[in-house]
Amino acid sequence: MGRTRAGKFAAVSVPALAVSLGFGVAIAQGLVSATLSSANGFELAGSKTTATSMKLGLGTAQVAGAAGATDKQAAVADMAGTKLTGMCMAANDTIPVFGNIGVKIATAPADITDVGAVTLNAASITAGTTDLPKTTVGQAASEAGVSSSSANPNGFALTSVSQSGTDLVDLTGMNATAYALTLESGLTLSSLNVTPTTSTATCG
C-alpha cells in the first residue's frame, strides 16, 4: 500500500489501472475535485490546451511503497483557467499471470473540457506549437508561486500570464507522462469513453 510523506507532492504507488478506473467513477459521481496519482506514470494528452496562466518549476515526486520511498525528478506545472480539447488519459499495469492490462479514458476529439485550476506533476511535458503571453524565465520558484513544496524556493521557474484574457497560454498537441494530477474544480464532460484493453493503452 502506498504512503505519502508530508512536504512532498507525491505519487502514491497504486496500480495505474486502478487510478484510471477510479477516475472514471469519480467523473460519473460528479466529484467536486479529483486527484490522480500513479508511481508508474500515466499519459495525459490533448490536441489543444489553453490556460490564462502557467507556472512551471522543478521538484520531485516521491513514490512510496513496500520497498521504501524513492524520489523522482519532476516538472511541476500549475495552470489556471485551463481547457483541454480532446482530453485523453491512458494507463498501463502488469498483473501477475495475466500480463499487461491498460485503460484509455477519452472525450470525443472535438470536445472542449473546462478543467479550471490544474496542478500537474510530471516526468515530461511535450507540445507542438506553443504560444505564451507575457513570460518571465528564471524567476525564483517562491516568487513565481510554484505549488510544490519539493521545489527549491530559489530554484528555476517560468511564468506566463495572460494580460487581456484573450492572449492565452496555448499548447498544441500537449502530451505528458504524469505522476500526479490535481483538478481543483473537478470535471463536467459532454462525453466519456472508458476502454480497458489487454494491449498497451495509448492516447496516440
Predicted regions span which residues?
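Intrinsically disordered, low-complexity segments enriched in small/polar residues
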Residues: 5, 20-22, 66, 79, ...
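Acidic, glycine-rich flexible loop segments
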Residues: 111-182, 190
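Short, low-complexity, Pro/Ser/Thr/Gly-rich segments in the mature regions of secreted, periplasmic
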Residues: 188-204
